[in-house]
Every structure is written in C-alpha cells, then in structure tokens.
C-alpha cells in the first residue's frame, strides 16, 4: 500500500496460537540470513520480534524468533473482521503490487503447504466479492478507491 491507500499485512497477534512453518537457518550462513530476515521484517517497525517455543510436528520443541504485530504501531488495525479489512485490502496498492495480490499469494502458499485458515478463507471470499463488483471484466488493477 501507500500512505494514501494503506494496505493490510496479515500478521500474528500477541497471545494467540497458530499453525505454520518453521525455518531453520543454516549454521554456515546464519549471520547473513538472519541479517536479511531482520532487515525485511523490521523495515516498517510493525513487528515485535519475540522468542517463542514452537511445538513441531515431530514432537520436538524448539525456540524461534517470531515476528508479532506491534499493537502500538499507528497502522495497527485491531478489528480483524473480514467486513472491516476486506475493503482496505481490495483497494490498496503500492510499488510492489496490490494488497489483494499479496493476499492471493498467501492463499497459494498455504494451499501448497496443505494448510487452511477459516478466518483467511472468509477474508478471501470478501475480497474476491469486492473485486468482482468493482472489476466485472476480471482484470485486477491497482486500487479502486
């Protein structure tokens, strides 16, 4: 998004639980990889990097850095209902593309991993409906607001 049409990141909120993918950084490139990860995730100041215990599918428990949304950030939206954020996602675009494209990319990654999230599915339905109403020809253009 942009300052005029801010997008919405889909981030973790403190205190919840989630299912996801944990990545182990290779020892030989740990410092370089962690530096890249840190720069990418911390550039906006939206996250609180937090050490968390993760329960892996194989029964192991590991410690990992998890980037949790900072509720004090000025762009934080506490109301995560689909009817509130779907219009923002459907309308927002920026130099890297549309916010809807970001959402659809996340959907595809979750499908590849065999994961499903009911809240995300509700959001996808709402955004697709808004886009269909505003782009009847099916061509996704940056921002309609």
List each model region and its residues.
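Glycine-aromatic micro-motifs
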Residues: 1-145
